[in-house]
């Protein structure tokens, strides 16, 4: 099923009575309540939910818990709190046979193997570069070697690397790959074999772009990009302004995701899980890139300009400075274009570590396709900058860390009032706004 067919199955009217409000006051300094989602109608026989936490040195990590789905479940982060509220009965989904289905080229994961990944303990997909490993660790090692990437550990170079925490520290993950026997020369030999086939490398790269066209990713960015010719300085509290802008952007975020190649081919519940896992990073990346044109502040989709001094006066200067320094300034310095922004956001969207996914391998493959298409794009568009692809990927850890801190600072606390984000996204996906 192609993307247009997947979207046609969702073409209904917007759910009535949906309203979103801001309730920032009275919550500062108090942890939000735990999530108690009941999504037993979505996953069977078990479902897993994850949360972000902080590892040593402030590095982000993913933690998870696995519980039977028939009853309400709780998700709690000891290190931080998510912008959530208690949740009533979620809208029931009826996934008809004509609904979104996985692409024929992306078979559902049904492989059972007796081997586990020597690096993180996840299920191994085979022996890669001399070691039984999962697709995630295989791809991580291959990118590290091919791009000659270097990492730094923010702790004592002894971070725990397992299925839940493998994204915490890239340095320690790479060192564990080496210590468990992964061979750098195996990656290089693999690449050499491809080159010896003549045009094979070009065909492979071109094929990746055809399956994940950057042109379509750019179209998704342009379709939801607010047209801002002029902007005015914000007068209200900057936290309120940011939350209200993000509140409105959640609508366009769902529409953006549906335009990303293959997203609507995933199971509907997986679409919700991916958006739930990445919405904060996706929004932050968007307004950071938009703020390239702003002077010492961020430019919101509403046209309001939030100055650095206002953020400091509101007590959120530290995280605001990080946004300006680690994201906005870096994007400005390298003149990151919207195609590159869209690809980075697609990488965030296709997060195979999001807990509860049923199509983990498909999502992993889609992320790899985005990587391949982005690499091809940077090589062809910026041939004089051979390190540009790696430079782009280095923004992702900063984006993840800042996204967590923004949640911790309650930037998006009670983002949609009493409407929990899970239910809101579910309704948006099930009943999208009419195409314009």
From Swiss-Prot:
Region (Disordered): 1-108, 189-209
Chain intervals with Low complexity compositional bias: 13-22, 85-98
Superkingdom, taxonomy of origin: Eukaryota
NR LBD domain span: 209-432
UniProt-listed PROSITE patterns: NR_LBD, NUCLEAR_REC_DBD_1, NUCLEAR_REC_DBD_2
Region (Modulating): 1-116
Region (Hinge): 183-206
Claim: Iron-sulfur is one of the keywords in the record: no
Positions bound to 9-cis-retinoate: 290, 301
Portion annotated as DNA-binding: 117-182
SUPFAM superfamilies recorded: Glucocorticoid receptor-like (DNA-binding domain), Nuclear receptor ligand-binding domain
InterPro entries: NHR-like_dom_sf, Nucl_hrmn_rcpt_lig-bd, Nuclear_hormone_rcpt_NR2, Nuclear_hrmn_rcpt, Retinoid-X_rcpt/HNF4, Znf_hrmn_rcpt, Znf_NHR/GATA
GO MF entry, a single one: nuclear steroid receptor activity
GO-annotated cellular components: nucleus
Subcellular location: Nucleus
Zinc finger (NR C4-type): 117-137, 153-172
UniProt key word NAD: no
Alphabetically ordered keywords of this record: DNA-binding, Lipid-binding, Metal-binding, Nucleus, Receptor, Transcription, Transcription regulation, Vitamin A, Zinc, Zinc-finger
Pfam families named in the record: Hormone_recep, zf-C4
Function: Ligand-dependent transcription factor probably involved in the retinoic acid response pathway. Binds 9-cis-retinoic acid (9C-RA) and, to a lesser extent, docosahexaenoic acid (DHA), phytanic acid, methoprene acid and oleic acid. Binds to double-stranded DNA sequences containing direct repeats (DR) with the consensus sequence 5'-[AG]GGTCA-3' and 1, 2, 3, 4 or 5 nucleotides in between (DR1, DR2, DR3. DR4 and DR5, respectively). Binding to DR1 is strongest. Transactivates gene expression when 9C-RA or DHA is bound.
Record comment regarding domains: Composed of three domains: a modulating N-terminal domain, a DNA-binding domain and a C-terminal ligand-binding domain.
Family: Belongs to the nuclear hormone receptor family. NR2 subfamily.
Protein's UniProt name: Retinoic acid receptor RXR
Taxonomic source organism: Biomphalaria glabrata (Bloodfluke planorb)
């Amino acid at each position: 099923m192609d993307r247009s067919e997947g979207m046609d199955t969702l073409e209904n009217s917007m759910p009535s009575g949906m309203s979103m409000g801001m309730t920032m006051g009275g919550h500062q300094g108090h942890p939000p309540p735990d999530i108690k989602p009941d999504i037993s109608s979505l996953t069977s026989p078990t479902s897993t939910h994850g949360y972000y936490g902080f590892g040593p040195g402030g590095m982000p990590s993913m933690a998870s818990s696995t519980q039977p789905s028939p009853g309400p479940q709780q998700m709690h982060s000891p290190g931080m709190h998510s912008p959530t509220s208690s949740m009533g009965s979620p809208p029931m989904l009826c996934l008809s046979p004509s609904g979104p289905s996985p692409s024929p080229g992306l078979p559902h994961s049904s492989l059972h193997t007796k081997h586990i990944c020597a690096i993180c303990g996840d299920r191994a997909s085979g022996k890669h570069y001399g070691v039984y490993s999962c697709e995630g660790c295989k791809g991580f090692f291959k990118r590290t070697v091919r791009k000659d990437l270097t990492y730094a550990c923010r702790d004592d170079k002894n971070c725990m690397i397992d299925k839940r925490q493998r994204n915490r520290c890239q340095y320690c993950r790479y060192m564990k790959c080496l210590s468990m026997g992964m061979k750098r020369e195996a990656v290089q030999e693999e690449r050499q074999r491809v080159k010896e086939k003549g045009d094979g490398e070009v065909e492979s790269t071109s094929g990746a772009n055809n399956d994940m066209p950057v042109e379509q990713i750019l179209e998704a960015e342009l379709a939801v990009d607010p047209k801002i010719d002029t902007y005015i300085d914000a007068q209200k509290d900057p936290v309120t302004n940011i939350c209200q802008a993000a509140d409105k952007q959640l609508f366009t975020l769902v529409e953006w995701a549906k335009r990303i190649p293959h997203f609507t081919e995933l199971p509907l519940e997986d679409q919700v899980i991916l958006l739930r896992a990445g919405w904060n990073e996706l929004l932050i990346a968007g307004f950071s890139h938009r703020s390239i044109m702003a002077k010492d502040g961020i430019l919101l989709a509403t046209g309001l300009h939030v100055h650095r001094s206002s953020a400091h006066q509101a007590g959120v200067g530290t995280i605001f400075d990080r946004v300006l320094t680690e994201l906005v300034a870096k994007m400005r310095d390298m003149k990151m274009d919207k195609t590159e922004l869209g690809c980075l956001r697609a990488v965030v969207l296709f997060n195979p570590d999001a807990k509860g996914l049923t199509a983990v391998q498909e999502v992993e493959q889609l992320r790899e396709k985005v990587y391949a298409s982005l690499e091809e794009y940077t090589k062809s568009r910026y041939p004089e900058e051979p390190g540009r692809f790696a430079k782009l990927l280095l923004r992702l850890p900063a984006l993840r860390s800042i996204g967590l801190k923004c949640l911790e600072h309650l930037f998006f606390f009670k983002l949609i009032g009493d409407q929990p984000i899970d239910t809101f996204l579910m309704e948006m996906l099930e009943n999208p706004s009419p195409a314009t």
